Swiss-Prot record:
One of its GO terms (molecular function) is structural constituent of ribosome. It is found in: Mitochondrion. Component of the mitochondrial large ribosomal subunit. Mature mitochondrial ribosomes consist of a small (37S) and a large (54S) subunit. The 37S subunit contains at least 33 different proteins and 1 molecule of RNA (15S). The 54S subunit contains at least 45 different proteins and 1 molecule of RNA (21S). The lineage of its organism: Eukaryota, Fungi, Dikarya, Ascomycota, Saccharomycotina. Its main location: mitochondrion. Keywords: Coiled coil, Mitochondrion, Ribonucleoprotein, Ribosomal protein, Transit peptide. One of its GO terms (cellular component) is mitochondrial large ribosomal subunit. This is Large ribosomal subunit protein uL29m. Residues 264-327 form a coiled coil. It comes from the Eukaryota. GO terms for biological process: mitochondrial translation. Residues 19-40 are annotated as: Disordered. The gene is MRPL4. Belongs to the universal ribosomal protein uL29 family.
Amino acid sequence: MFPARRGLHTTSRACARTRFTKPKPKPAKRENVRLPTQRTHHDNDLKITAPIPPAAANLTCPDDHPLWQFFSEKKFLRTPEELDTLSRPWTIPELRRKSFTDLHSLWYTCLKERNVLARENHLVQFNFEAQTEAYQDISEKIRTTMWRIRHVLSERDWAFKIANEKFAVEKQVFIESFEKDFLEAPANEDEEIFESLQRFQYAIYGISEYIDENKVDRTFVDGLKAVATLKLKKFALRNEDIKNFLEESNNTIVDAGESFLLYTSENTESAIAEACQAVRELRENGSSVSRYDELETVQEYVNKLAEAQMAKVTEAEIQLQEEDAKNNANTL
């Protein structure tokens, strides 16, 4: 009789063999056994070579690596004799004659040089325990130039703010004065007076003659309307049809689409007359731009005009290249 063992009522079920727990039969011995396709480190061809000692010659660094900017002419460390000790900081009067681009470039040149000096000063002070006065003196000169650059930029910023405050009071007077001179100029001075109109629109409304450089905002759209009205008034004194169109518009252009069409037309009497006829057709068709959609619509117009101008420039360059190729072929 077998001795009884205590167990749970699920023990027999858990210990029972199933088709998943039965051991699989041993596979039959194969006659054609293939060799492994990958050679292991136990191969007899293994050769032990001497370790390669770490050295700078074993490392390669591209010449355009950004971290080279922390080194002066790719030198690990300059000696005090190699430093430029005869230079002086830029003076404020000298910096006032520089443009914003020049000041921006000079600022970052000074900043990079100070970073190079700070690294060299740290190496000399903590690694070689030598004197660092030469590095600190040059860094202080550069720092003087940098705070003077900020001083000049601050002067310009305050001058711009004060001029804007004063001009806000006199702006309308200036616009009326320019409009009077613009309309009273004789026809033989059209070229000069329209050049002054370009300077006027850039100074008052920020409208550049290069269409792709403009930022479309409320001031830009208001400037388009003002310039379009000025061009109509200029040629209304010479053309009766343009005069009638201006009277129909109550002596001002208020639609952004109409103003853009008149603004982009040539500064000639015939071109303005054609633009007036095109605007009449737009009005007859009921095509207008809502004031709420002016910015988005004008931005689309500007983008399309810029693309068209770029296509013309590309086509002209291709034609010029073809002509040069023909001339060279004829020469040969």
